[in-house]
């Protein structure tokens, strides 16, 4: 009998507690506050994201991980910290990707080599390195950019873009728009070869040097294009 009474008492306590929580949780979370100023994310972005289904629940019923997953779906958001504030608010900390290069003309690369997108009106692409390749190779291309740029700087040359194709063949473009086709494998000896032969290249009148193909074991092939009129 005592055991039965204890069970009944526990059930009543649980039921009343659950009903009390439900009464407190009738109103959904309706407001948020950012803990710091963001570079790219607007209030409209957050409102639109939080309004997506499933709808927000009340303070006790809302799963923080669900809110975090919604916000992480924003392409330029790298990480999120979300905290519930009673009775109906969220405290949100957004960590955004920092763009360090333009990727395939339309997207950006972060410092970690992660590909992400930004609305065109949020950032000016001018001055960013231009990098190209499969999205899975973002980190590799970014590291190559840093190494090749330093290598060229030691030779008084400046780098404009780096590209790798699906076969792992590399092409770089100098700031004077000359394209160096490096192919696969180690690029340092190929750049050395270019530096050696560059002064000896005889550019025809009315033409400019367009590319130097360094994929050969010895020597190189060169191509020219008309000077702009």
Swiss-Prot record:
The regions listed as transmembrane in this protein's record are 1-21
Q: Where in the cell is it found?
A: Cell inner membrane
Mind listing the UniProt keywords for this protein, alphabetically?
Cell cycle, Cell division, Cell inner membrane, Cell membrane, Membrane, Transmembrane, Transmembrane helix
What Pfam families would the database entry show?
Answer: FtsQ_DivIB_C, POTRA_1
Among the GO biological process terms of this entry, one is:
cell septum assembly
| All residue ranges annotated as the POTRA domain in the record | 27-97
Q: Which PROSITE patterns match?
A: POTRA
Q: How does it assemble?
A: Part of a complex composed of FtsB, FtsL and FtsQ.
What is the protein name stated in its UniProt record?
Cell division protein FtsQ
What is the species of this protein?
Answer: Actinobacillus pleuropneumoniae serotype 3 (strain JL03)
């Amino acid at each position: 009998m005592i055991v039965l009474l204890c069970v009944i008492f526990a059930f009543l306590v649980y039921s009343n507690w659950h009903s009390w929580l439900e009464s407190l949780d009738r109103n959904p979370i309706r407001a948020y506050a950012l803990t710091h100023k963001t570079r790219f994310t607007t209030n409209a972005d957050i409102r639109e994201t939080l309004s997506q289904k499933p709808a927000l629940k009340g303070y006790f019923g809302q799963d923080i991980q669900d809110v975090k997953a919604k916000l992480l779906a924003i392409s330029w958001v790298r990480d999120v910290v979300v905290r519930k504030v009673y009775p109906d608010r969220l405290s949100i900390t957004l960590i955004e990707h920092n763009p360090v290069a333009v990727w395939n003309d339309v997207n950006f690369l972060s410092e970690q080599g992660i590909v992400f997108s930004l609305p065109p009106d949020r950032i000016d692409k001018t001055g960013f390195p231009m990098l190209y390749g499969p999205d899975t190779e973002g980190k590799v291309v970014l590291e190559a950019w840093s190494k090749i740029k330093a290598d060229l700087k030691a030779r008084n040359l400046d780098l404009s873009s780096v590209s790798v194709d699906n076969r792992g063949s590399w092409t770089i473009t100098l700031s004077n728009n000359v394209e160096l086709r490096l192919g696969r494998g180690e690029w340092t000896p190929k750049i050395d070869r270019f530096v050696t032969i560059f002064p000896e290249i005889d550019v025809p009148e009315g033409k400019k040097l367009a590319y130097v193909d360094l994929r050969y074991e010895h020597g190189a092939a060169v191509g020219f294009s008309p000077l702009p009129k």
